[in-house]
Each structure stands twice: as structure tokens, then as C-alpha cells.
Regions:
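Catalytic His-Asp segment of secreted/periplasmic serine-dependent ester chemistry enzymes
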Residues: 115-200
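Cell-envelope and extracellular/periplasmic
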Residues: 1, 11, 41-46, 66-83, ...
Length: 200
């Protein structure tokens, strides 16, 4: 839902109200002479296994120039009530399958956006599962990504001297401030790849 953000799923160019909207706004304003096409295919509640099922339609068939992936918090959230966590090996296998297929069957550059959790009391216990999965994500990023946004650390930094509720009401779903913050980071990563000659 962080990427989905209420988008109109009948129109993949409609970016909802979350970070994709802000990222596109920044990129368009900083590159006014380039007509970029932005597609948002985020689906609220999806986990890594759902991305595997969507590989053909949402990645391979489209053949994008850049793929950005922000996945993983739901692999933790959906099991939090029972604490019957998905093992890290299965999480990695799912994520690795997605990244391998993108590498092998498209020419897309890959931007991975790390999953994050803000310091809110009722979800602190998520860390017993989430931290290991962030480690997996970072390891996969070193292997597959052209650029990486270490969002968990950056959001932790943003909460120093600023209440977590400034960014998110529940510690997981960004509000307008949080979405703008992530969108800015996305645009910075995009510009970094552009400057390095990885795009275009």
C-alpha cells in the first residue's frame, strides 16, 4: 500500500498519493525537457511471493528502462499477529527469483528501496523478523541493484529530533510528509543513476 497509495488500478500511469507521485514530480521538474513515462503497479498488501506471480505481466511484458522495487514489510506485517514469521530463506528465494528474472529477461536497471519501520511502540516487536529481512534485502541489492535506497536507516535518521508521527501515523504507511521524503530520495537516486550514465 506504500507504493499503491490509492492509485487507480485501471490506469497504470495514475500514481496515487504516495511516494511515486512525489518522485515523478521532482524528476519532471528537474528534467523539464524529457518526457518520462511513469508506471505504478504497486498492489496494497502484496508480499514477495505475489511479485513472483506478477513477474511476466508487470516486469517482462513491459520491458521498462528502470524498475524500482519496494517490497517486504508485508512479509512481516501479515504474520505479526501469530509471530509465525516467514523464514528468511523463503523470503530471499522469492526476492531473488524476481531480481534474477528482471536481470535475465529485461534490460532494465534496478533500484531497490529498502523496507522500513519507524520507532512506534506497538510495532517494535516487528524487528525480531524485519531486521533479518532487511539484511537479506541489502545483500541482494549488492548483487543485483544499480542503485539502493537504505530507507530504514534514513527514516531512523529522520526521526532524530522529530516525532515518528511527522512521517507516518502507524510507523509503516507514510503520510504526506513521509511520501514526499521518500519521493525526494527516489529522485536523488534517479539523478545519481542518470549522472553515472546508467540510464538513457
Amino acid at each position: 500500500s506504500i507504493t499503491d497509495a490509492g492509485r487507480d488500478r485501471s490506469d497504470p500511469h495514475e500514481l496515487g498519493t504516495g511516494y511515486p507521485l512525489y518522485a515523478a514530480k521532482y524528476i519532471r521538474s528537474e528534467h523539464p525537457d524529457t518526457d518520462f513515462e511513469f508506471i505504478d503497479l504497486g498492489i496494497s498488501g502484496d508480499q514477495t511471493i505475489n511479485l513472483v506471480a506478477r513477474l511476466q505481466a508487470d516486469f517482462i511484458d513491459i520491458q521498462p528502462d528502470l524498475v524500482s522495487i519496494h517490497i517486504g514489510i508485508n512479509d512481516t506485517w501479515h504474520r505479526a499477529e501469530t509471530r509465525e514469521w516467514l523464514d528468511n530463506e523463503t523470503f530471499e528465494a522469492n526476492y531473488r527469483k524476481v531480481l534474477t528474472e528482471i536481470k535475465e529477461k529485461t534490460n532494465a536497471k534496478i533500484l531497490i528501496i529498502e523496507q522500513f519501520l519507524l520507532p512506534v511502540p506497538d510495532k517494535e516487536f516487528f524487528r525480531e523478523d524485519l531486521n533479518g529481512k532487511i539484511d537479506v534485502t541489502r545483500r541482494l541489492a549488492r548483487e543485483f541493484a544499480d542503485c539502493y535506497i537504505p530507507l530504514d536507516g534514513l527514516m531512523a535518521k529522520a526521526c532524530v529530533g522529530c516525532e515518528p508521527t511527522h512521517w507516518s501515523a502507524d510507523g509503516v504507511h507514510p503520510n504526506e510528509n513521509g511520501s514526499d521524503f521518500i519521493g525526494r530520495l527516489y529522485a536523488d537516486a534517479f539523478n545519481e543513476m542518470l549522472k553515472a550514465g546508467k540510464l538513457g
